[in-house]
Amino acid sequence: FQILLYLLVLILVIYFFLWIWNFFIDELPQDQMVYGVTFSKPYAVELGLDWKEIYLAILDDLKVKNIRLIAYWPEVEPKEGKFDFRDLDFQINEAVKRNAKIILAVGRRLPRWPECHEPSWTLNQNLEVKNEKLLEYIEKTILRYKEVEAIKYWQVENEPFLMRFGICPKTNIEFLDKEIALVHSLDSRPVIISDNGEVSIWINARKRADVFGTTMYRVIWKKPFGYFRYPLPSTFFRFKDFVSKIFTGELFGQPKKVIVIELQAEPWGPEVTTRLTLEEQFVSMDFEGFKGNIGYARRAGFKEVYLWGVEWWYWLKEKANEPRFWEFAKSKIF
């Protein structure tokens, strides 16, 4: 009991220190920041949008120059052994035309609900067979795009150590290492491994990464508690960065690049966004919260930040007569 008491006191002291430290931290200058977005074709379709129209608007109206694209397994291999890269080709080719830089994510666990994305034809396969098919899809994807100079990073899986979120099998660390090794064997560009910013410890993901990506969320909805705002100052991320370096051997060596792979810039409610009223959407992400999160990320000290929710901003502008998010991003961020 005494040890637990000492541990609690230590946590409270650190927490108090982080808030004091936070008062002395300035936002990184805008000209030092590199901003990007994540684009998800299935999410754009779910919102009732023409996915090509919004994608081109991201590139031409927002003028985004850094974009994370996703090679969803069910989309690129809809039938076993039959690959269809046409939609992903379109996304990559249009980005290349505009001199945008790309992160290309591959794997089973990728952005957007249900987090793990598998083709329907794998439903009755055992895990061993399924994993072999997964490696085949990853290899096909990397080989197809390895000559694209605009791709600056590969991302292997998305938050693979966040095992209690999403409809996913438990992460097999040995198999994850196999995926990473496969990508390294096919191309020399850095591999991103990402982890949750608030509740994960980063060490397992960071030690496997060439570039480490953290998520950054401020307001979430969690059953049975409802809406919850993380009571964390931006210095929490600076502290976590420092501590994780100790355990990965980076403190006195060459530190790895750390980026914010997902900065919350859309709602997180009890249901998918399309089922929420506009009023309910704004509970977890209103315009002031949107701007506040961008400032929060700049104070956290990471110079490369990918905003999460560009499809929603466009939906607000086109379907809900609420253009402020899109216009702010256009004039102040990109």
Q: Where do the protein language model's features map onto the residues?
A:
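Hydrophobic faces of well-ordered beta-strands that scaffold small-molecule active sites
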Residues: M33-F39, I67-L69, I102-V106, K152-V156, ...
